Structures are given as structure tokens and as C-alpha cells.
Design a protein with these regions (language model features):
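Bacterial N-terminal signal peptides that target proteins for export
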Residues: 1-7
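Intrinsically disordered, low-complexity regions enriched in polar/acidic and amide residues
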Residues: 2, 17-20
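Short helix-onset patch at the extreme N-terminus, typifying the N->h transition
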Residues: 7-9, 28-29
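Bacterial N-terminal signal peptides
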Residues: 8-16
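Immediate post-signal-peptide N-terminus of mature secreted/exported proteins
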Residues: 20-58, 121-126
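C-terminal amphipathic alpha-helix
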Residues: 24, 31-32, 39, 86-126
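Long, amphipathic, charge-rich alpha-helical segments that form helical bundles/coiled-coils
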Residues: 53-104
Length: 126
């Protein structure tokens, strides 16, 4: 019994000692995905959505600055890095929408090919 407990404690200590670190780009992608989920969440009221997206815009802008100044990403040939910088308008959502003087929601929707007319012509079904 004691030996089993000792093995369990040793395994737990070894596994918990390995810290998982996400890079700056991965953190940006995670935050951007959460922001897009908030944009399209049908359960939020307009006031709740505005409040959440205002906070998200500040977080995204900070994370985008971190990614743009991250020296580790320069010259890195991973697919994530290449794809992220090729689709600048979607990856760097806060900066791209500010450059075009549009809200993040309208900028994202236009970049993925959705228009107001298309959205208004759809019907909600569950």
C-alpha cells in the first residue's frame, strides 16, 4: 500500500513539474477565438456583448502588440506563424479593424464574407 502511494506521489510530482508554455501567437489565437465566440453568441444581449467586446478589444490589442514585437517569431517557419501573418486582417483583428475605422465585428464579418443583407435574410432555427 505504501509503495503504491509512493509511486502515485512520485508520478504526480514528475508530471506536475512539467510546465506547459504557450507562445505569444498561441495566446493571441486563443483570445481571438474567444472573442469571435462572443461576437456570434446568440444568448448575449446587446449591452452584454458590447461590454465583453470592449474588454476583448483591449486584450487583443495588447496581445497583438506582444506578437508583433516577439523576436522568437521572426524567421520561424512553422505553419501557424506563416498562416497567421498571411491572414493579417483576421489574425490581428483589433489593429486591422482600427486601421479600417470599423468595429471588430463588422471587420471580421466582412473578412469571412458575411454581409448585413445576408445576415438579415437568414432565419433562426434551433
Amino acid at each position: 500500500m505504501k509503495q503504491k502511494l509512493l509511486y502515485t506521489l512520485t508520478a504526480t510530482m514528475l508530471l506536475s513539474g512539467q510546465a506547459v508554455q504557450a507562445g505569444s501567437l498561441e495566446n493571441l489565437e486563443r483570445e481571438r477565438a474567444l472573442t469571435v465566440m462572443e461576437m456570434i453568441d446568440g444568448e448575449l444581449s446587446a449591452a452584454e456583448r458590447w461590454e465583453k467586446l470592449s474588454a476583448a478589444k483591449r486584450r487583443l490589442a495588447d496581445l497583438e502588440r506582444i506578437v508583433l514585437s516577439d523576436k522568437k517569431l521572426q524567421g520561424k517557419a512553422s505553419q501557424l506563424v506563416q498562416r497567421s501573418f498571411q491572414s493579417f486582417e483576421l489574425t490581428f483583428l483589433a489593429h486591422a479593424s482600427a486601421e479600417k475605422q470599423r468595429s471588430m465585428q463588422s471587420h471580421w464579418m466582412s473578412e469571412v464574407g458575411l454581409s448585413t443583407d445576408e445576415l438579415l435574410s437568414t432565419r433562426v432555427s434551433r
